[in-house]
Amino acid sequence: ACFIGDDTKDIYLTFDEGYEYGQTESILNTLKEKGVSATFFVTEPYAKDNPDLVRRMIDEGHVLGNHSVTHPSAGMPSLSLDKQENEVTENHAYIKENFGDDMYLFRYPTGRFREQSLALLNNCNYKSIFWSFAYLDYDVNNQPDHASSLQKMKDKLHPGAIYLLHAESETNAAVLGDFIDAVRAAGYGFKNF
């Protein structure tokens, strides 16, 4: 697992990519305009369905992370260790073969894991990336209010914060630029893994 335990005033923006609802291009545009690099955790179906967006992520200096093949809704612990390994290695092989990117970060679907899962990732030369901030942004049919979402994000700002945002969220696409500006106004910067 990766814990950023320093006191530098930097934060990490991460986006989970399981489905595309037309918001990722706007997010990439904002990141480019603001000069911020982020980590995008992609599933294999997402990469297959959106190769131009994945290529753009890489070309614009973002880090790709592995988010499994099928994004099991019951979490990785619901699978046998062999199936968990397949979730990691199959997506890794697909991204490596089709995009030339050698991913080394993994985010557990739903955040669920067990000790054996961590050992498996270590054996696959992966680091687990969790988060210190997440909110209910993933339901495209029930998007949170822009102003309150931005305030929640600002309220959780702290050195080493890892923000988990879902790229299918219209709210995240709408407030990202303002959030980046607020982070910088508070004296913080952005890092990537």
Language-model regions, residue ranges each:
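Catalytic grooves of carbohydrate-active enzymes
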Residues: L157-F193
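Alpha-helical scaffold elements lining the catalytic groove of polysaccharide deacetylases
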Residues: Q23-S26, P72-D101, R112-P159, N172-D178
